[in-house]
């Protein structure tokens, strides 16, 4: 997910997306532990998407306060 795509979304949409990614991250972690994970690069991609969403959500929250 690109940063521009994330910035275009509202805070509610970002929170929904964050929840979805956290569930996916849990499932990927579980697959890795059981040896069923095929796309190992997806773990890194999901982790970075979560960080990107959290960062932009924080920026939007700060802008709305100011």
Curated annotation (Swiss-Prot):
PANTHER family named among the record's database cross-references: 60S RIBOSOMAL PROTEIN L35/50S RIBOSOMAL PROTEIN L29, LARGE RIBOSOMAL SUBUNIT PROTEIN UL29C
A Pfam family that the UniProt record links to this protein: Ribosomal_L29
Organism of origin: Brucella canis (strain ATCC 23365 / NCTC 10854 / RM-666)
Keyword Ribonucleoprotein: yes
One GO term describing the cellular component: cytosolic large ribosomal subunit
Gene3D superfamilies with a match to the protein in the record: 1.10.287.310
Coiled-coil features, chain-numbered ranges: none
A molecular function GO annotation: structural constituent of ribosome
GO biological process: translation
Record family assignment: Belongs to the universal ribosomal protein uL29 family.
Record keywords, A-Z: Ribonucleoprotein, Ribosomal protein
Protein name per its UniProtKB record: Large ribosomal subunit protein uL29
NCBIfam families membership: L29
Protein origin, superkingdom: Bacteria
Statement: the UniProt record of this protein carries the keyword Ribosomal protein: yes
């Amino acid at each position: 997910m690109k940063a521009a795509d994330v910035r275009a979304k509202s805070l509610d949409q970002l929170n929904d997306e964050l929840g979805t990614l956290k569930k996916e991250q849990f499932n990927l972690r579980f697959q890795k532990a059981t040896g069923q994970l095929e796309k190992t690069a997806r773990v890194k991609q999901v982790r970075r998407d979560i960080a990107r969403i959290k960062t932009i959500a924080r920026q939007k929250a700060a802008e709305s306060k100011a």
